[in-house]
């Protein structure tokens, strides 16, 4: 290699030969250091985000999974329910039952029988009864009428025909039913035939709808009593042993719901109907007060009839006494709000029941709910935004009732 003289520029090859080689530690250590730094930055980012998401007021909080522990909260699992409408062979509405599972874990529930003769609204002609609503709009109009009466939506509605009842009731049949009188039918030629004799009758699957549909007086209360007797006897038979063994092997929500309800304590409700005499005819009307109270008991966590119409509520027990959960929930529902979250306050020992709101526009709703519960109100801009209102049950809950 020749030495450059002043003014000469070294060639590229000369410059490369002049640059000293990097030490082995730098050649391998720097890339490794860079990879480690990037990985560690990712770990710190994930850890930081987790800390922020799990923190409140500058303190790290662990998720509470024990339903009995302070701080536990959960979105409600809305009550599983179904409207079951039955048509006879001519397509006429003969029975409506609202089935609600009170406890998804332990089984049991309530069945409300609604007579087709009950007065309704929205018909094109008069008189307007549930049976007329069915004639005009089928099961959709029946569902609309009954849910409006209850002020609660149902999970689903199903239409039952004679063949479908034969299939559903078959595995647990015949069902013994006690009848106080002979049920006499008139044949097409005018002769009378005893269709179901007085006393204990074993109702075959193919005769279920004939019994449920057998005509009665104008108000339909006699037929409602027979329907109640059949439902009670059938549910007893379904509930023996494994309920699913006493129902058809079909993947239907109705089958699963009936198995769940029959597997626990069952309540049959057929009382909130009153026969009112008018100048022309006897009319069957609903006792709105009884229906409203029954709806609170049937639907522990109801589906809102019109979502967003009522304030949503987060209900927290601040007493540490779980026996107050159910009465507090019922009191809140009677106040006309939608229950969305239930749980426990972050600590026990709360003295005063109060309704917390974060939006001044909800002050009126908070005051109304507080008055219904006998508690106070508190405005807190930092209250949970999950619901419109937060109810914290305190030790004064019973004295406020």
Task: Give the residues covered by each predicted segment.
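Non-catalytic, solvent-exposed segments at the cell envelope interface
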Residues: 2-401
């Amino acid at each position: 290699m020749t030495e450059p003289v002043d003014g000469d520029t070294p060639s590229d090859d000369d410059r490369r030969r002049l640059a000293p080689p990097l030490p082995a530690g730098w050649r391998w250590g720097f890339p490794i250091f860079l990879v480690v730094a990037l990985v560690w930055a990712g770990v710190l980012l994930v850890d930081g985000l987790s800390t922020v998401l799990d923190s409140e007021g500058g303190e790290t909080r662990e998720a509470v999974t024990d339903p009995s522990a302070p701080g536990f909260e959960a979105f409600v699992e809305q009550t599983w329910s179904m409207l079951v409408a039955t048509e006879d062979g001519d397509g006429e509405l003969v029975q409506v039952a609202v089935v609600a599972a009170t406890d998804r874990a332990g089984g049991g529930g309530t069945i409300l029988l609604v007579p087709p003769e009950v007065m309704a609204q929205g018909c094109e002609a008069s008189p307007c009864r549930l049976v007329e609503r069915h004639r005009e709009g089928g099961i959709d109009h029946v569902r609309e009428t009954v849910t409006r009466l209850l002020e609660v939506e149902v999970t689903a509605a199903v239409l039952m025909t004679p063949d479908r009842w034969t299939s559903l009731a078959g595995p647990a049949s015949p069902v013994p039913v006690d009848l106080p009188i002979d049920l006499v039918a008139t044949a097409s030629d005018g002769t009378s035939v005893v269709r179901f004799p007085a006393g204990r009758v074993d109702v075959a699957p193919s005769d279920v709808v004939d019994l449920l549909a057998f005509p009665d007086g104008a108000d339909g209360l006699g037929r409602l009593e027979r329907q109640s007797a059949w439902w009670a006897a059938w549910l007893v038979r379904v509930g023996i042993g494994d309920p699913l063994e006493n129902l058809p092997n079909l993947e239907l929500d109705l089958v699963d719901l009936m198995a769940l309800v029959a597997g626990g304590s069952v309540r049959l409700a057929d009382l909130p109907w009153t026969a009112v005499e008018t100048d022309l005819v006897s009319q069957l009307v609903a006792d709105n007060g009884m229906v409203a109270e029954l709806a609170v008991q049937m639907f522990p966590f109801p589906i809102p009839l019109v979502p967003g119409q009522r304030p949503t509520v987060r209900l927290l027990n601040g007493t540490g006494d779980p026996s107050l959960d159910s009465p507090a929930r019922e009191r809140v529902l009677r106040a006309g709000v939608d229950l969305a979250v239930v749980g426990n306050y972050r600590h026990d020992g709360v003295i005063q029941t109060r309704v917390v709101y974060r939006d001044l526009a909800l002050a009126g709703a908070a005051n109304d709910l507080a008055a219904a519960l006998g508690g106070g109100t508190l405005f807190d801009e930092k209250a949970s935004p999950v619901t419109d209102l937060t109810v914290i049950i305190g030790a004064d809950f019973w004295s406020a009732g």
